[in-house]
C-alpha cells in the first residue's frame, strides 16, 4: 500500500478495541486516515477508546480541518464467543454503510492450564474467539475487498503456534489454526489486491500476560517482552506492505528453531513441576 493518508474514505475494523493493543490499532489506523469500526464486549472501554481517538484526531496538526469533518466511528458491543458474532458485526457495518478495507482480528484470551483441567466453558470460549469468529469475519469481508480490488487483513497468530506445550497448548493450538487458514486465504487472494498478514507475537507487555511488575520489567530489559506500541507498529507496517507475516523481537527469531525441537519428556517434566501453580479456569 502507498503510505498516503486515506482521507477517511474507507473503514478499518478492529476487534478487541476497548483496551490494550486493540485501542492502539484503532488510534494508528485513524492516523492513517481510516474511519474506525470498534468491536468489543466492553461498552465502557469502547466509549473511552472513541473519546481518545476523537481527541487525537481533532488535535492533529497534520490533518486538514475540512478533512477532520469526514472522520467517523462505529462502536459495536459484541461478545465474540457467541455463535452469531460475525453475523451481528457484519449486519451492523452493512446497515451503517461501512466499506471495510482493513480487518484486524485482534481480540484474544489467554490462560495457562492443561486441557483436562480447563473448564468446557473456557475451551469453547477460546475456540470461538480465536478461531470461529475471526475466520467468519474474514469470510464475510473478503468478498467485497476482492470486488473493490483492495483490502488488508491482519490476523494475530503467535509464536505459540509452534508450541504444542502443556499449559499453553490450547492457546497455541488455536493460534496454529489462525496461522494455517491465513496462509490458505492469502494464496486464494493472490492477484486480487487483497492480502492477509499474520503477526506472530511472542510476549507483549499487556495485561493478557499475568506477571508481577518486577518480572515484567526484567522481561522488557532482556528484550524477551516488547511494548504493545512496538508490536502494533510492526504488525501494521507488515500489513500495509502486504507481507505474509511478521515476528517482532530478536529473541523470538533466535529461539524459534529450538522451541520446535523440545522433546515430549522435557515438556512433560516441566509441566508436572509447574502444574501446582497454574490457575483453574
Please provide the spans of the model-predicted regions:
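SDR active-site lid
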Residues: 188-251
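Substrate-binding pocket helix/loop in short-chain dehydrogenase/reductase
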Residues: 114-127
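Conserved glycine-rich Rossmann-like NAD(P)H-binding loop of the short-chain dehydrogenase/reductase
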Residues: 34-48
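Canonical Rossmann dinucleotide-binding motif of NAD(H)/NADP(H)-dependent dehydrogenases/reductases
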Residues: 2-37
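Residue(s) in the substrate-gating loop at a strand-loop-helix junction
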Residues: 158
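Conserved NAD(P)H cofactor-binding loop of Rossmann-fold oxidoreductase domains
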Residues: 106-111
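Active-site helix of classical SDR
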Residues: 138, 174
Amino acid at each position: 500500500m502507498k503510505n498516503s493518508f486515506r482521507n477517511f474514505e474507507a473503514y478499518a475494523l478492529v476487534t478487541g478495541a476497548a483496551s490494550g493493543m486493540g485501542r492502539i490499532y484503532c488510534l494508528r489506523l485513524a492516523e492513517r486516515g481510516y474511519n474506525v469500526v470498534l468491536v468489543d464486549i466492553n461498552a465502557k472501554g469502547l466509549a473511552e477508546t472513541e473519546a481518545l481517538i476523537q481527541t487525537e484526531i481533532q488535535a492533529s496538526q497534520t490533518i486538514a480541518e475540512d478533512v477532520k469533518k469526514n472522520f467517523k466511528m462505529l462502536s459495536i458491543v459484541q461478545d465474540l464467543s457467541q455463535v452469531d458474532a460475525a453475523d451481528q458485526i457484519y449486519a451492523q457495518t452493512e446497515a451503517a454503510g461501512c466499506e471495510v478495507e482493513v480487518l484486524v482480528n485482534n481480540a484474544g484470551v489467554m490462560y495457562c492450564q492443561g486441557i483436562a483441567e480447563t473448564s468446557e466453558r473456557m475451551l469453547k470460549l477460546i475456540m470461538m474467539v480465536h478461531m470461529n469468529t475471526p475466520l467468519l469475519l474474514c469470510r464475510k469481508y473478503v468478498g467485497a475487498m476482492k470486488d473493490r480490488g483492495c483490502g488488508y487483513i491482519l490476523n494475530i497468530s503467535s509464536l505459540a503456534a509452534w508450541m504444542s506445550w502443556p499449559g499453553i497448548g490450547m492457546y497455541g493450538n488455536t493460534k496454529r489454526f489462525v496461522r494455517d487458514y491465513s496462509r490458505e486465504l492469502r494464496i486464494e487472494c493472490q492477484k486480487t489486491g487483497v492480502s492477509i498478514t499474520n503477526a506472530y507475537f511472542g510476549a507483549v507487555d499487556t495485561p493478557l500476560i499475568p506477571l508481577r511488575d518486577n518480572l515484567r520489567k526484567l522481561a522488557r530489559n532482556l528484550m524477551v517482552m516488547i511494548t504493545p506500541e512496538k508490536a502494533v507498529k510492526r504488525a501494521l507496517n507488515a500489513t500495509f506492505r502486504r507481507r505474509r507475516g511478521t515476528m517482532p523481537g530478536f529473541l523470538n527469531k533466535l529461539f524459534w528453531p529450538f522451541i520446535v525441537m523440545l522433546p515430549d519428556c522435557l515438556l512433560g517434566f516441566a509441566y508436572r513441576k509447574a502444574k501446582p501453580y497454574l490457575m483453574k479456569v
